[in-house]
Amino acid sequence: MKIETQCLHEGYTPKNGEPRVVPIVQSTTYVYDSSREIAEVFDDPTKSLIYSRFENPTTDAVEKKIAALEGGAAAMCTSSGQAATLCSILNICQAGDSFIASTSIYGGTINLFSITMKRLGIECIYVDPDATDDEIQAAFKDNTKLVFGETIANPALTVFDIERFANIAHKNGVPLIVDNTFATPYLCRPIEWGADIVIHSTSKYMDGHAVQVGGVIVDSGKFDWTGGKFPCMTEPDESYHGTIYTEKYSFAPYIVKARMQLMRDFGCYPSANSSFLLNLGLETLPVRMKQYCENAITVAKFLESNDKVESVAYPGLESDKYHKLAEKYLPLGTAGVISFVIKGGRDTAAKFMDSLKLASNEVHVADIRTCILHPASATHRQLSDEQLVAAGINGGMIRLSVGLENVEDIIDDLKQGFAAI
């Protein structure tokens, strides 16, 4: 099936007399006829449902849909994008390990990797996404367990060279994890380019309406965990009757382990209602992404021609540094987020933003409504000046999330903002 059809039909097929729309199963628990049956489910939680702390029929339908959209073997939803990022790392890293990440990633992820992971005894080694192969290779250590990057970085809009980083990661016997939030599987499917694990903040384009907070992890099912670097996958799990994930769940051992261990212990699972809302957003994802891309390229060209704008970052522009990579990985478009640097720095940026009427000042992105943010004052506020530079952010940078309003109205709003500075 094509992705437009998958968004509507994957994950849930109603039987005779059942609801057409994925139903909300608002229940914490599930009933069995005998204690023996419950015991059997606890021996192998993949056979049936136990408790809504880590599985639910509504969420299960969404997980199956997203796995299909990304071309993966299985998926696990989480209560936020940050929870997905955290679980994706902790599933295969422990104290004493290290991992490699692109410098051009979301500010909250940088805080997670630089501060919280360090407190857990896990080292994050950053590399410039434009580094040479030799420079990237030099970052690897004997204890390195994975490589991490974002398809389209938030907010610098760097396009991550997935295939190149995948090849280097695999050469070193470790998986590549890609955050595909901004691209969505409509614009890019990282697994097709060599990524092993794909994550999302589903609060963004997948939802599209700013009504639920969530995340998801997708297991490609393709990575070979038996190379000796991942005893957590290949040796008995003492918390689950000595289960060896690569042997018992060879179709998707990574995601099964994440659910049976991390979700069981952390409980960062979304509510059934959140999953229901997410599914509604997914059903219109292709239609929305087409319009986001169409509106954004028009707005980006307008900004590029404005003499009060110092620079524009939007990979869809032919002048953009990452346009060639965008043509390779994102041939249908580069989503709806634009970053631009306004002349005059931070104070001028604030005056411009405060003068807008249509675009909302808010800590969100990828909504159907146009919104705007000053990253250095908000999402990346906790970073040092050095970290801001490494992430491609300066005081005059504004992140514009182009919505689905008529593009002429969006541009008119920007024009009156420029007139105020």
Predicted ranges, named:
Residues K15, V31-S35, D224-W225, L285, ...:
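Short, acidic Gly/Pro/Ser/Thr-rich loop/turn segments
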Residues M289, I297, L303-E304, K308-I398, ...:
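Conserved C-terminal alpha-helix-loop-beta "cap" of PLP-dependent enzymes
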Residues M1, S114, E123-C124, A138, ...:
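PLP-dependent enzyme catalytic core of the Aspartate aminotransferase-like
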Residues S34-L86, G108-M117:
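Conserved N-terminal alpha-helix of the aminotransferase class I/II PLP-enzyme fold
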Residues K15-N16, M206, G267, K328-L330, ...:
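Short Gly/Pro-enriched turn/cap motifs at secondary-structure boundaries
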Residues M1-N56, K64:
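N-terminal "arm"/small-domain region of PLP-dependent enzymes with the aminotransferase-like
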Residues K47, A73, V213, S274-L278, ...:
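Short amphipathic alpha-helical segments
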Residues E4-T13, A75-S305:
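Conserved PLP-enzyme active-site core in the AAT-like
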